[in-house]
């Protein structure tokens, strides 16, 4: 999974069993990447994927991830706490209480121009459905939004 950290550092994170488990540094501040991997080792549930979202609203970009994740053509995943979304990751499952956070990772042309999301698919009931291509909604998603 591609990752752009707040300081602009880029990495590819490895996902196993629904969790970030390490990865490869690409560019930027190597210490940022190493600190993230060390945190995953100390407290593995901080890297658990707990949300996948697709923007569905025709709105202008605000520069605030919490709002921009809702804009049509964006996709985001989140790690960490998921109990507020009906998930099972509650604060007591973290090794360190300060790590019991919900961290959104937004993919959008204005936010992550270095990362190209060519296609997003959902695999359900043995079938793949394309939801987005090149930050644009697929006909399937457009039909759902009509």
Name every feature range the model reports, one short phrase each.
Residues 1-146:
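Metal/cofactor-centered catalytic core regions of large enzymes
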């Amino acid at each position: 999974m591609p990752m752009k950290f707040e300081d602009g550092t880029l990495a590819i994170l490895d996902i196993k069993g629904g969790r970030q488990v390490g990865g490869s540094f690409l560019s930027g501040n190597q210490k940022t990447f190493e600190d993230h991997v060390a945190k995953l080792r100390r407290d593995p549930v901080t890297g658990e994927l707990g949300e996948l979202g697709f923007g569905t609203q025709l709105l202008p970009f605000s520069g605030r991830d919490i709002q921009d994740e809702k804009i049509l053509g964006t996709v985001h995943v989140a790690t960490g706490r998921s109990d507020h979304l009906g998930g099972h990751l509650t604060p007591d499952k973290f090794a360190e209480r300060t790590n019991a956070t919900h961290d959104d990772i937004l993919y959008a042309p204005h936010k992550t121009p270095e990362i190209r999301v060519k296609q997003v698919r959902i695999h359900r009931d043995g079938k793949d459905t394309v939801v987005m291509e090149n930050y644009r909604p697929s006909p399937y998603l457009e039909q759902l939004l009509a």
